[in-house]
Amino acid sequence: MKPNYNVDRAPKRSDEPVWWSLFGAGGTWFAMITPVTVLVLGILVPMGVINAEALSYDRVVSFATSIIGALFIIATLALPMWHAMHRVHHGMHDLKFHTGVVGKIACYAVAGLISALAVVFIFML
């Protein structure tokens, strides 16, 4: 007996899992790491809770030029940008701005550009 449904033997693959993984990583980074960074750099150091010598120019440059520091700075800039541009892309669709592939390319190109600039600027240190 033949089944009453068709199975597509060559389904069209979606690129959405790639964008969703960057979206998820950016959202997680923005929710967990960014508030701590803002707390330390924007509140605790200016209030004197953390000694300002801990963030002297020489120490910050040595951190930024280390592999862990460089990856931290790149992730701090790039991952939230991928998250934001994914939200912009899907937000435009929700607001009935159907830009199609051009809108998708524009949104993800901006995120890619910011990511590339973060890497370039880190290597310029």
Swiss-Prot record:
Any GO molecular function: succinate dehydrogenase activity
Record-linked Pfam families: Fumarate_red_D
Subcellular compartments: Cell inner membrane
GO BP of this protein: fumarate metabolic process
Membrane topology: Multi-pass membrane protein
Gene3D superfamilies: Fumarate reductase/succinate dehydrogenase, transmembrane subunit
Domain of life, source organism: Bacteria
Segments crossing the lipid bilayer: 30-50, 60-80, 105-125
Principal location: membrane
CC per GO annotation: fumarate reductase complex; plasma membrane
Keyword entries, A-Z: Cell inner membrane, Cell membrane, Membrane, Transmembrane, Transmembrane helix
NCBIfam families: PRK05470.1-1
Similarity-based family: Belongs to the FrdD family.
Function: Anchors the catalytic components of the fumarate reductase complex to the cell membrane, binds quinones.
Subunit structure of this chain's protein: Part of an enzyme complex containing four subunits: a flavoprotein (FrdA), an iron-sulfur protein (FrdB), and two hydrophobic anchor proteins (FrdC and FrdD).
Protein's name according to its UniProt entry: Fumarate reductase subunit D
